[in-house]
Amino acid sequence: MEYIKSNKVVLIGDGAVGSSYAFALVAQGVADELVIIDLDEDKVKGDVMDLNHAAPYGGSPVKIKAGSYKACHNADLVVITAGAAQKPGETRLDLIEKNTKIFKSIVSEVMASGFNGIFLVATNPVDVLTYVTQQVSGLPKEKVIGSGTILDTARFKYELAEEFGVSDRSVHGQIIGEHGDSELAVWSQANIAGQPLYQLLIDDPEKQHRIEEIFVNTRDAAYDIIQAKGATYYGIAMGLVHITKAILNNQNVVLTVSSRLEGEYGQEDVYIGVPTKINRQGAVEVFEIPLNDEEKTLFTRSVGILKEMQNKISHLIA
């Protein structure tokens, strides 16, 4: 009998994002095996039961179970959504330091299992924690990927699609940089069927104000959702499944994930959201979008902010 390799995913973190990802993964039939790890074992037990009951109506058969870090040893992909949430009065730096310590522990446990697959990081601040994951794991940069600006790009496409009355799948545009306040829209390359959208907006006096509004709506969407319902999880969960499919199915698609730069865009030693080819080997190639002078300045600023954060937590992962 011919041996057929199965696709095994281990999910670390069964909170709102993690459980949403698990559901979407099962619904779309992306993996053959899903193992869920979380400190709240009762929550995992309940979700495993619930997901197994949903699986018969999913995309394809999948084995779902609770597990420990030992399950990572033969996993193709380890997805990390675990981490501390920001508390009232807590600074962003406090949160970064707290999650860096958590990640150092998680990644060390995963590597101790003999894991040699690909890490996919979603916990915020995602760019910095992806950097932490690569530093602690010692894996090649191709094997450590962050969700980056994949959700921001989806939000940007949604806003543009609404503005121009077309399907979001017909919109070509990217948000790059930090997944956060310093991200930027690559307006100079955004288009529908080759028509430059920035020019269409700037040439229409009644729509010029929409350029800033579209970007602000994109950048600040998370704040609006959090204010309305407490957290964001469906969008990022679907984005993570999209990346998962690209990896497990060797799709060679280009997605705006958090990748490590080594000279691209004139930058190095930083994880940041940029268009990257994703396949079974991981993040194999960064694509350099032509940026205008303003976009180059904004991107350099975003890199500087991320490097400053990396430097502030470097002593925790030395």
Swiss-Prot record:
<feature type="binding site">
    <location>
        <begin position="122"/>
        <end position="124"/>
    </location>
    <ligand>
        <name>NAD(+)</name>
    </ligand>
</feature>
<feature type="active site" description="Proton acceptor">
    <location>
        <position position="179"/>
    </location>
</feature>
<feature type="binding site">
    <location>
        <begin position="83"/>
        <end position="84"/>
    </location>
    <ligand>
        <name>NAD(+)</name>
    </ligand>
</feature>
<keyword id="KW-0597">Phosphoprotein</keyword>
<feature type="binding site">
    <location>
        <begin position="124"/>
        <end position="127"/>
    </location>
    <ligand>
        <name>substrate</name>
    </ligand>
</feature>
<feature type="binding site">
    <location>
        <position position="105"/>
    </location>
    <ligand>
        <name>NAD(+)</name>
    </ligand>
</feature>
<keyword id="KW-0021">Allosteric enzyme</keyword>
<dbReference type="InterPro" id="IPR018177">
    <property type="entry name" value="L-lactate_DH_AS"/>
</dbReference>
<dbReference type="GO" id="GO:0006089">
    <property type="term" value="P:lactate metabolic process"/>
</dbReference>
<comment type="similarity">
    <text>Belongs to the LDH/MDH superfamily. LDH family.</text>
</comment>
<feature type="binding site">
    <location>
        <position position="157"/>
    </location>
    <ligand>
        <name>beta-D-fructose 1,6-bisphosphate</name>
    </ligand>
</feature>
<dbReference type="InterPro" id="IPR011304">
    <property type="entry name" value="L-lactate_DH"/>
</dbReference>
<feature type="binding site">
    <location>
        <begin position="152"/>
        <end position="155"/>
    </location>
    <ligand>
        <name>substrate</name>
    </ligand>
</feature>
<keyword id="KW-0560">Oxidoreductase</keyword>
<feature type="binding site">
    <location>
        <position position="172"/>
    </location>
    <ligand>
        <name>beta-D-fructose 1,6-bisphosphate</name>
    </ligand>
</feature>
<feature type="binding site">
    <location>
        <position position="69"/>
    </location>
    <ligand>
        <name>NAD(+)</name>
    </ligand>
</feature>
<keyword id="KW-0963">Cytoplasm</keyword>
<dbReference type="Pfam" id="PF02866">
    <property type="entry name" value="Ldh_1_C"/>
</dbReference>
<dbReference type="GO" id="GO:0005737">
    <property type="term" value="C:cytoplasm"/>
</dbReference>
<feature type="binding site">
    <location>
        <position position="147"/>
    </location>
    <ligand>
        <name>NAD(+)</name>
    </ligand>
</feature>
<dbReference type="GO" id="GO:0004459">
    <property type="term" value="F:L-lactate dehydrogenase activity"/>
</dbReference>
<comment type="pathway">
    <text>Fermentation; pyruvate fermentation to lactate; (S)-lactate from pyruvate: step 1/1.</text>
</comment>
<dbReference type="InterPro" id="IPR001557">
    <property type="entry name" value="L-lactate/malate_DH"/>
</dbReference>
<feature type="binding site">
    <location>
        <position position="17"/>
    </location>
    <ligand>
        <name>NAD(+)</name>
    </ligand>
</feature>
<feature type="binding site">
    <location>
        <position position="232"/>
    </location>
    <ligand>
        <name>substrate</name>
    </ligand>
</feature>
<keyword id="KW-0520">NAD</keyword>
<dbReference type="InterPro" id="IPR001236">
    <property type="entry name" value="Lactate/malate_DH_N"/>
</dbReference>
<feature type="modified residue" description="Phosphotyrosine">
    <location>
        <position position="223"/>
    </location>
</feature>
<feature type="binding site">
    <location>
        <position position="43"/>
    </location>
    <ligand>
        <name>NAD(+)</name>
    </ligand>
</feature>
<protein>
    <recommendedName>
        <fullName>L-lactate dehydrogenase</fullName>
        <ecNumber>1.1.1.27</ecNumber>
    </recommendedName>
</protein>
<comment type="function">
    <text>Catalyzes the conversion of lactate to pyruvate.</text>
</comment>
<feature type="binding site">
    <location>
        <position position="38"/>
    </location>
    <ligand>
        <name>NAD(+)</name>
    </ligand>
</feature>
<dbReference type="InterPro" id="IPR022383">
    <property type="entry name" value="Lactate/malate_DH_C"/>
</dbReference>
<dbReference type="InterPro" id="IPR036291">
    <property type="entry name" value="NAD(P)-bd_dom_sf"/>
</dbReference>
<dbReference type="GO" id="GO:0006096">
    <property type="term" value="P:glycolytic process"/>
</dbReference>
<comment type="subunit">
    <text>Homotetramer.</text>
</comment>
<feature type="binding site">
    <location>
        <position position="92"/>
    </location>
    <ligand>
        <name>substrate</name>
    </ligand>
</feature>
<feature type="binding site">
    <location>
        <position position="86"/>
    </location>
    <ligand>
        <name>substrate</name>
    </ligand>
</feature>
<dbReference type="InterPro" id="IPR015955">
    <property type="entry name" value="Lactate_DH/Glyco_Ohase_4_C"/>
</dbReference>
<dbReference type="Pfam" id="PF00056">
    <property type="entry name" value="Ldh_1_N"/>
</dbReference>
